[in-house]
Amino acid sequence: MTSSAVLNQHLIDPEICIRCNTCEASCPVGAITHDSNNYVVDAAKCNFCMACVPPCPTGSIDNWRTVPIVRAYSLEAQLGWEELPVELTADELSAGQSLANDASDGSPAQVATTAAGVSTPQAVSAPPNYGALCAPWSAAVPQVNVYGPSANDPDKTIATATVTGNVRVTQVGKQNDTHHLVLDFGTVPFPVLEGQSIGIIAPGLDAKGKPHHARQYSIASPRNGERAGYNNASLTIKRVLEDHEGNPVLGLASNFMCDLKVGETVQVIGPFGSSFLMPNHPHSNIVMICTGTGSAPMRAMTEWRRREQKAGRFEGGKLLLFFGARTQAELPYFGPLQSLPKEFIDIEFAYSREPGLSKRYVQDALRDRSADIGKLLNDPNTYFYVCGLKAMEEGVLLALKDIAEEVGLVWDEIGAHLKKDNRLHLETY
């Protein structure tokens, strides 16, 4: 059998995937897409660059099946999967070889695109990807997949946490309903770091009679707990009332979580994430850029740094926060943020729909502080974190590029250093 008719097809395991969108956001050629059921890889577009593999929090992206090219699994087939298909036998591969010879002139490109049901793809120029794939050198070592399908211990499939707090953190009476929830794990070890996330499994079954897929939420508390020394963690969750097109819909997990009462329990898996972690070395600076519930990891990092400085265990280092929302009323944690000392954290709010004010986005706020940001871009001890809706990512990167050039830096060189030194972290969805 000639290798030209065989494809080592890149696939995503639907049983392990937590639908966090990390793979789709990381793919530079648009080969990964999704529907309400699964995330899938287009065999006709995937160029095996592997950019999606390191950021995946669960390892569900790192799966492969050897198939005859004419039998490459289509997007339609993958979207309907509940588990990965078994490996083909040698006889099945041989039979596929015969089909390949009969169906085409033997061109791998032709049979691959025929199998995937698309026309021959045009060459795709991948845009530069400046996001870090690893944590800062001084970050704490994370534990991942302690609970869930990927757990090393088969007895640790799910952890149970008890709700000990649930408070709204956006203005009451407004449509944007965001909650701060505190989950207590009791005697169950559940180690998390700032920048990691967990998966929440909503109760009940889906339309197919299967347990619901876990929904991913970023940790909003420091590593030693929402209350220092306690085995608890907090989340920032917005109640989903409409889909991306603006159509009315009740988000399953978000509404379940926002409606929880103190004393009720939830099923948790994780933790996930090994790269979106904060630096811990003295004099390290952190620039945080976020919108909405993207503030969760920023709150965690800020509180850990505050506790460390208060205890005299951290020396120097700047904290800058660029926080965007449509209005002040929709901005989570507005009150507590106002009470933080200005010498501890430098905060810029950006409102795009505040009555009486001009539209201002986080990228505008960055440009307004170009002198400060320009210096920090060139400082090897400064780390940038971007978290929020995917739509903000391009605007933020363009702003950083403009600022770099404004202060006489070459963006391609600075961008390459940011990536190599793991100084620019992107977590958008």
Where are the predicted features?
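Cysteine-centered iron-sulfur cluster-binding motifs in ferredoxin-type domains/subunits
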Residues: Q9-G30, V40-G59
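Flanking helices and flexible, charged tails adjoining ferredoxin-like Fe-S electron-transfer domains
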Residues: M1-Q9, K45-Y130
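Short, compositionally biased
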Residues: L75-Q78, G209-R227, M278-T291
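Short, charged beta-turn/beta-strand-edge "cap" motif at the junction between a beta-strand
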Residues: G204-A207, G270-S275
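A short, basic/flexible loop-to-alpha-helix module at the beginning of a structural domain
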Residues: T2-L7, F272-H281
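Ferredoxin-reductase
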Residues: G148-D153, T160-K261
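Active-site beta-strand/loop microenvironment that shapes enzyme catalytic pockets
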Residues: P282, I286-R307, M392
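Reductase modules of NAD(P)H-dependent flavoproteins
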Residues: V124, A132-L133, A140, Y147-G148, ...
